[in-house]
Structure formats: structure tokens, C-alpha cells
Amino acid sequence: MRLLLDTNVVLDVLLARSPFDEDGATVMSAVETGLAEGFLCATTVTTIHYLTAKAVGRKTAEKHVASLLRIFQIAPVTGAILSSALVSNAKDIEDAVLLESGRAVSIDAIVTSDPFDFKKTLGISIHKPADILRILGV
């Protein structure tokens, strides 16, 4: 299964934001062990670095990003993806970019701590980490 992790799931894990961090960490482990194919949107990587550097320092943020780049594939953000996101009628441009970026790499699902932010979309399911773990049989 091809999964795109929302920025909030990764931040939950890296910043130990309870109660969401445990399920998110298990999803990331499932990707790392090959149980699922994992993707991060390119914008997620820069956001993760920025926010974790503010919280835990630049060196730690760089280590986190390096680790993520070893585990996950990166879904691109191009001009066409940004244009599609702008005309998507989504209430949040960040979520629209994640969705369109994931669509470009044929993801099956988005894993997010807040599934209500994403509108219903054809072909891509939206799941909380605990739900995707059940689907994966973890």
C-alpha cells in the first residue's frame, strides 16, 4: 500500500506529541520495514525542518530530516501540482498540495491526525494512523 504521511503525523512522532505519537511511530516503522511504501510531500520536509529546528535545535532537525529521507520517498511539488491545488476548492492550500502531490505518485491513502481537513477524493482514502495500522494488520 502506498501511503503519504501528512506533516502532522511526522511532527507528532518527532516532537513526541501525545496521544498521537505512538500510532504515528508504528506507521513509520511499517514503512521502514517495507510493510507499506511511504511518501512525504516535498513541502512536508521543509516544514518539518523548520518546526523541529525551532523546538529542538538545528542539528537535531537535520538528523530528523536525514532519517526521514532514508525511510520515505518524496512526492514532488511542481508548478502543475500547485496550480491543481489552487483550483481544487480545498479550504486549506497546504492539504490540497499534499493531496495533489500524492496523486502525482499514485498513493493509495493519506495518513493524517486530522482526517476532517481533507475533502472526499476519488481513489485516495484518508485515514488516521490507528486506522491504517488496522488495515495493514499491524
Language model regions located:
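Short acidic-hydrophobic, aromatic-tinged amphipathic segments that line or gate anion-handling sites
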Residues: 75-77, 126-129
